[in-house]
């Protein structure tokens, strides 16, 4: 008989954002006259910019002509995009990443999910709490986590991110092999200094560990002293893989383009202690399981690196960060403590009560959708909610007025 991967039975309920969508749909069915403002899932609300659309259109036109048609492209991505990424996102900040260390994909979610496939089932993993659920769930599926008990999986080393440590976790007190970090952080919006990030790199070097660094929100950093890439830290190219996306800075949530950086100096080890190139392993996995991002989408992504494209992306970021400022200011007035909103589009708010209860209250009384912190971590996330700045200024103002009334 055909049998299942029983690790899937260890997963907790449904995926967080699917659960939220179901609750919202039920509320709207029961209250069709009420307008709902969604500040939960981090989906952008503005259209693609003129430079991106122009490049997209031109590439689509090329696909209609036999002489300029593009069929299967290089699985790792076209050189024109990889070179633009290397020059603008890394070399311009003193990081020595080169084009062939970049793997273009259709989303950071896929990459952060799939990267764990190249590591052994016995790998000891450290994951922040709270955390983007994908990091944890994919390791549950792979059988690395053990059973779930008292709000946590038995074999995971949890890195608590709390008010006491400014939502930047401390180094683990036990030896781990694989470390997930995300800055600016999702969900908390917290950031890390270069000195703070160096401590993690030094730990990884000393323990022959690897850091998986999710930098999907780096474009929202307003403080020039903060690192945008882990490769700004000396030695990180030997112990870190970085993930980035065009989803938020360029509005590609529905277009789908991202990339992963695997430096050639980055190594992992077999059971006998022999080193192996993670670049070679990821390339093998990538080429086996992925056929590449479409040519028009890669041309659209490359347009974000033109002078016009950069200016347009900055305008998008400024638009959402202005919204974040409004959210934070409103909760200052209400007396709710929070983190984020300064270098991140997310505001992590202490709701002073159970996360799901606060979620239900805001939905029923204010018609506003947030994300309950417990969905990111039942221990350190419960009691908080995440509000996203991805919406129009008009809706943000309206939502804040409703929240103020509901909490009065």
Curated annotation (Swiss-Prot):
The keyword RNA-binding does not apply. CDD domains: AAT_like. Substrate binds at residues 15, 42, 109, 132, 186, 291, 386. Pathway: Amino-acid biosynthesis; L-lysine biosynthesis via DAP pathway; LL-2,6-diaminopimelate from (S)-tetrahydrodipicolinate (aminotransferase route): step 1/1. One of its GO terms (biological process) is lysine biosynthetic process via diaminopimelate. The keyword Transferase applies. Its EC number is 2.6.1.83. Keywords: Aminotransferase, Pyridoxal phosphate, Transferase. It holds the Pfam family Aminotran_1_2. The modification N6-(pyridoxal phosphate)lysine is found at residue 248. Disulfide bonds: none annotated. It catalyses: (2S,6S)-2,6-diaminopimelate + 2-oxoglutarate = (S)-2,3,4,5-tetrahydrodipicolinate + L-glutamate + H2O + H(+). Pyridoxal 5'-phosphate binds at residues 72, 108-109, 132, 186, 217, 245-247, 256, 291. Its cofactor is pyridoxal 5'-phosphate. GO terms for molecular function: L,L-diaminopimelate aminotransferase activity; pyridoxal phosphate binding. Belongs to the class-I pyridoxal-phosphate-dependent aminotransferase family. LL-diaminopimelate aminotransferase subfamily. Involved in the synthesis of meso-diaminopimelate (m-DAP or DL-DAP), required for both lysine and peptidoglycan biosynthesis. Catalyzes the direct conversion of tetrahydrodipicolinate to LL-diaminopimelate. Homodimer. This is LL-diaminopimelate aminotransferase. It comes from Desulfotalea psychrophila (strain LSv54 / DSM 12343). The lineage of its organism: Bacteria, Pseudomonadati, Thermodesulfobacteriota, Desulfobulbia, Desulfobulbales.
